Amino acid sequence: MDDPRAVVHSLVRRNLGKDKTIFGQPVKAVPGRVAKSMRPEEAFRATLSDCLAQITANAATLRPQDSRDERRSVEGLHQLRVSFRRLEVALGAFGREFGQDWLEELRGRAKILAGRLAPARDLDVFVVKLLSEPPKSGVAGGLPQLRARAEAARDNAWAGVAACISGIDFERFADDVAALASSQLPLTRDQRLARTARRMLDRQVRRVKRRGKMARSREEGDLHQLRIALKKLRYTAEFFAPLYPKRAVTRYLKQLRGLQNYLGDLNDVANVRRVVGELMREKVKKDDDSAMRFAAGAMVGWYGAQVPGAVKQALKRYRNFKRVTPFWQ
């Protein structure tokens, strides 16, 4: 059977939702199709196609079947953001390796579209996960109002998601990426994929090391930059994983994903202050205000008290990760 991923971008975008047995569930990244026999340009195009397939498949899980159908797949939105981030990394990493600065414009468009999805994802995490974890003692009176405020903001954010995936910017972006993935534009003179992969992976490791040194400050922004650098390393490693022994790849990626997920959870906690601050900026009735604001402040304080210990554990995990031998070296 032919691999359908080369054409799934157009198939899903035009027909998705008509056959729920095929396209009804959120889609995680497919294993890379990069092969040792490929030239660097071919590996780039295969990676673009896979990223776009994931984008269009997950966007489709969020599109309504009719006017009465309201799609809200928390996991589908999460995987859609992941697929945009993977595509950003592919365009940035390959673009730098090939010396093709014009790919930065396409990467910027991916970043803009991903940014339009961010408010809904942040509020999903806040409502589904973060609101349910703090102790309720002493703040129960204000939590229902805080939840109602968050749910209303979440509804608005999800309306933004619907507008994004049905808008012309999304449509044109998908078409442009599909065209690039199927083009034969000369992008590099280097014909040796193994050497290209090693350079790109080493470049990501150097970025991680720089961010790791900065993260010793334990400042929120520096830890955030380390998380982003690790994410770029992980995605690049996954792109080229088929070129290397499976056992070594699996061992390395297991450590990398564990560290990245831990920093991701820490980032969610750090976002509580920002999300609550945005919710509190809206005007409310005076009789609801004090209880809700007390609950909001207690929530920020409860999560904030956990941050120092979590940061300490994150840096310990990072030190352990540094001792893991990269599978391409």
Which residue ranges define each predicted feature?
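Cationic, histidine-enriched alpha-helical/coil surfaces that engage anionic ligands
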Residues: 1-329
